Amino acid sequence: NYAGNVSTQECADNYARAFQVLYQAVKKSDRNARVFISLDHTWTAWTGDGHPGKEYLDRFAYYMHATEPQMEWHVDYHPYSNPLYRNDFWNDWSSTSGSEYTSYISMNNLWVLTNYLKKIENRYGIKNTDKDGNPDPTGGIRVILGEQGYIAANSSQEASQAAATAYEFYIASANTKVDAIMNRAYLDDPAEGIMTLGLRYNRS
C-alpha cells in the first residue's frame, strides 16, 4: 500500500478506489465473501512515515459512502503492542488508553476500535441490525485480527508469551465484532532479530 509522499486524503482515496476494484473481482467469484482493509496498531500517533489509522479510516469510510455506499467493507486490524516487543500489553495505559484519541490500539484497548466502528456505522447508516431491528452480531463492519504476536527469545520469556497469547484470545472471543484472530508466526524468523514472535523456536 505504498503510495509515495502523498496526503492521508489522497492515499486513502487511492486505496478506496483500488478496494472497489478488488471488491468487484472478489464478489464475482464468491458473492458471500467479505473484503477487508488492513490497518496496523498506530491509531493517532504520528510516527514520521505512513498515516495514522484513525484519520485514514475516517477518510476511507467517507469516500466509500460518497462513491459506493452499497459496498460492504470490513477491517483487518494488527493490534501489536507498543513497543512491538512488549508482552504485558495489559499494563500499558500510556500509549494504549481507553480514549477514542489514544495513540495506539493493541489488545489492551481493542474496544476503542470496535466502538469507533459502531460510530462509523451510525454515521453512514451501515446496517448492523436484523430485519426486525435487533442488533445483528454478524452485521455491520466486521473485524479480523490478522496479525499480532508476542516474543519469546528464550525459556525465561515463554510464560509471558503464553500469557499474552491466551489473554488475546480471551479478549477477542469476548468482542462480538471480532470474527477471527491469527498470530504472526508459528516459528521464529531469524531475519526479524529480537522480534522472536513464533510460538516455536527456529533452531535451524
What are the language-model segments listed below?
Residues 3-4, 98, 154-204:
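Aromatic-rich peripheral "rim/lid" segments of glycoside hydrolase catalytic domains that contact
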Residues 9-158:
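Noncatalytic carbohydrate-binding groove/subsite architecture in carbohydrate-active enzymes
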